[in-house]
């Protein structure tokens, strides 16, 4: 699988706006809307992900709410695969299963339709989101996929905030690919 070189990574990184002190002092928020507004950068990213995953043997792509929907649905369309949304509670209309996870000050959860991966036994799922920080949501999403008897074969992120340790935690459950590491 082709990896991006330093120049290609810099190109993508430069297409993402960094906003200091948002949502609170000391945080640098990575605003992907500028990448989405740049058709060349967005298509470059999607071409890269398509090349990486076109022969990966994936049955489904699952995206984490909400920015994982953008990249996941776009990649699923390119690969002609079904897309499965992993959502916050009470957003899905049919019967769901849930996985709780801890936040700094509380608990949250993610949900998926009970039949999200259809009748396929051991469905191979690619999980995708824009960013991994502490990894709580991604870990819960992998555990949620496991509850359905499907298998998360890899978790893909546009950005890995390495210093927050999420990828280190998540790699105990599945393989990880991050386009950019910050």
UniProtKB/Swiss-Prot annotation:
Q: Which GO terms describe its biological process?
A: adenine salvage; AMP salvage; purine ribonucleoside salvage
Q: What is this protein called?
A: Adenine phosphoribosyltransferase
Gene Ontology CC, one term = cytoplasm
Name of the encoding gene: apt
Query: Which species does the entry assign this protein to?
Result: Campylobacter curvus (strain 525.92)
Q: Which reaction does it catalyse?
A: AMP + diphosphate = 5-phospho-alpha-D-ribose 1-diphosphate + adenine
Annotated family: Belongs to the purine/pyrimidine phosphoribosyltransferase family.
Q: Which cysteines are joined by disulfide bonds?
A: none
The record's PANTHER family line, in alphabetical order, gives: ADENINE PHOSPHORIBOSYLTRANSFERASE (PTHR11776), PHOSPHORIBOSYLTRANSFERASE DOMAIN-CONTAINING PROTEIN (PTHR11776:SF7)
């Amino acid at each position: 699988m082709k990896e991006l070189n330093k120049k290609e990574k810099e190109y993508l990184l430069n297409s993402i706006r960094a906003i200091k002190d948002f949502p609170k002092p000391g945080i640098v928020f990575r605003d992907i809307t500028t990448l989405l507004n740049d058709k060349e950068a967005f298509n470059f990213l999607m071409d890269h992900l398509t090349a990486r995953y076109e022969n990966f043997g994936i049955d489904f792509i699952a995206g984490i709410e909400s920015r994982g929907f953008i990249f996941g649905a776009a990649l699923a369309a390119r690969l002609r695969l079904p897309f499965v949304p992993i959502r916050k509670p009470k957003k899905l209309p049919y019967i769901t299963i849930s996985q709780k996870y801890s936040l700094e000050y509380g608990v949250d959860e993610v949900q998926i339709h009970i039949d999200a991966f259809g009748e396929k036994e051991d469905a191979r799922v690619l999980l995708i989101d824009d960013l991994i920080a502490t990894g709580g949501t991604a870990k819960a999403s992998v555990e949620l996929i496991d509850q359905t008897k499907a298998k998360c074969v890899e978790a893909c992120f546009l950005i890995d905030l390495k210093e927050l340790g999420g990828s280190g935690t998540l790699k105990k459950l599945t393989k990880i690919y991050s386009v950019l590491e910050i």
